[in-house]
C-alpha cells in the first residue's frame, strides 16, 4: 500500500525498517518522512505526531493455542470500547475473570500493551516482546497463556506456520485501540518554516492519495489479498 500511495502522490519512496518502539522518535528526528506500519490513530500518539485520515480498520484480538482452557471463552464477536454498551461491559467482565493469574504476551510500545496495563481487564501478568514474531514464538512454545495483538497478526502467523493458533473472545476496537490505522507524520505546527510547510503538504498529499486509493478499490484489494478480508475504511 505504501508504494501505491507514493505513486498516487507522484513520489518515489524508499521503505526502511525501524524497531517499533523507536518508530515515533525516529520520525521526529527526520530519519524518514512517514510511518506506514499498521499504526493505530490514538489520542496519545496525536499529542506528538500527526496522522492522515484512516485507511484501514484494524481490530485487536486474543489468541491461544488450540486445546487451551481459554479456547471456549464465550463473548460477543466484536466490541467497541469507544462507547461500550452492555454487551461490551459484560464481555470485559468475562475476559477479566478468564485472564486472572494468566500470563499475557504482547509487543512492547503498542496499544495492546497499554490496554493490558490500563486495568480494564484487571491485573494480569503482562510479558512484553520487542517484535510480534517473538510473541508468536513464545505463544507456540507455551511460555504465554494467551497473547494480544492485531487479529491479522495471529491469523497470518497461523496460516504461514501451520501452528494451531486460534482467536478467542471478542475482537476489540475503539477507545484505547484507536480509530483505525493511518499514515504517521511529523506535526508541521511544531516545526514552522520550510520544514513545517513540507510536512503539511505531505499530509495533504497522503490524504488525497488515500481518497483516490479507496475510490479505485486499491486498499480493499490489497487487504483481501494479504489478510483475507476487507479491512479498508
Which positions does each model-derived feature cover?
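Short, well-ordered beta-strand segments
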Residues: 103-106, 147, 184, 194
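Acidic, polar ligand-binding/catalytic clefts
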Residues: 3, 7, 12-94, 165-180
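Periplasmic-binding protein-like
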Residues: 57-64, 159-207, 209-233
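Bilobed "Venus flytrap"/periplasmic-binding protein-like clamshell domains
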Residues: 1-7, 61-131, 151-152, 217
